Design a protein with these regions (language model features):
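Conserved donor nucleotide-binding strand/loop of the catalytic core
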Residues: 29, 43-74
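Cell-envelope/extracellular polymer assembly enzymes that use nucleotide-activated donors
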Residues: 3-5, 30
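Catalytic metal- and UDP-sugar-binding loop of GT-A-like glycosyltransferases, i.e.
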Residues: 56, 81-83
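Short, well-formed alpha-helical segments that are part of the catalytic scaffolds
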Residues: 8-27
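Short, conserved active-site loop motifs that form the nucleotide-linked donor/cofactor pocket
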Residues: 4, 51-52, 107
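Conserved SAM-binding loop
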Residues: 3, 10, 14, 38-41
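A conserved acidic beta->alpha catalytic loop
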Residues: 23, 35-44
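Catalytic-site signature of metal-activated, phosphate-bearing donor transferases
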Residues: 61-68, 75-81, 88-158
Length: 158
C-alpha cells in the first residue's frame, strides 16, 4: 500500500482550506501546508483538521523546493493541491489505486483530470476540463520557474 503526502501552498485561505483538507484526508498519510504567513485563520483551521503547517515568507517556488530538504518527505508520493481544489470521493479512490499500482514502477508522476467550476457549478464550455501533473514521487519533480501559471515538471521517468 503506497503512502501519500498532500502538499497545499497557502496564503489567507481560511474560506477554502477546510473543504480542501476534508476532500483529501481519507487518502493522505500526511497533510502539509506550505503557508506564506497567512494573517487570517488558515493555520488554525488546518491544524484543527490534523494538517502540519510550515510557515515561511519564502516565495512559492522556494517553498516547493523545500520538500525533501528542509521538510522531509518519507511517503511514496506527493499530491499537490491548491486550497481551492477538491477531490471527489471517486477521484480520491482512483488516485489511491493508481499510486498503489505504480509504486514500484518507473512511473514518477500521475496526470490528473480536473473540471473548472464557477459559483458552485461545473463549466461546460471552453477549457472547462483539463489535465495537470499533480501527483509525483518525492525528488522526481520540480516547479517551473515562472511568474504565473507555473507547472510541476518531472525530472525523469514517466
Amino acid at each position: 500500500m503506497s503512502t501519500i503526502t498532500v502538499v497545499i501552498p497557502t496564503y489567507n485561505e481560511d474560506k477554502n482550506i477546510a473543504e480542501c483538507i476534508i476532500s483529501c484526508r481519507d487518502i493522505a498519510d500526511r497533510i502539509l501546508l506550505l503557508d506564506n504567513m497567512s494573517t487570517d485563520q488558515t493555520k488554525e483551521i488546518a491544524e484543527s483538521l490534523g494538517a502540519e503547517v510550515f510557515q515561511t515568507e519564502r516565495s512559492y517556488k522556494e517553498r516547493m523546493a523545500m520538500l525533501g530538504g528542509e521538510i522531509p518527505i518519507d511517503t511514496d508520493w506527493i499530491l499537490y493541491m491548491d486550497a481551492d481544489e477538491r477531490l471527489t470521493p471517486e477521484s480520491a479512490k482512483e488516485l489511491k489505486v493508481l499510486c498503489d499500482e505504480h509504486a514500484d514502477a518507473d512511473v514518477n508522476g500521475i496526470v490528473c483530470r480536473y473540471r473548472q467550476r464557477f459559483l458552485g457549478k461545473d463549466l461546460n464550455y471552453g477549457d472547462s476540463v483539463g489535465r495537470k501533473l499533480r501527483v509525483f514521487k518525492p525528488g522526481r519533480a520540480y516547479m517551473e520557474d515562472m511568474e504565473l501559471d507555473e507547472h510541476i515538471v518531472l525530472r525523469s521517468g514517466r
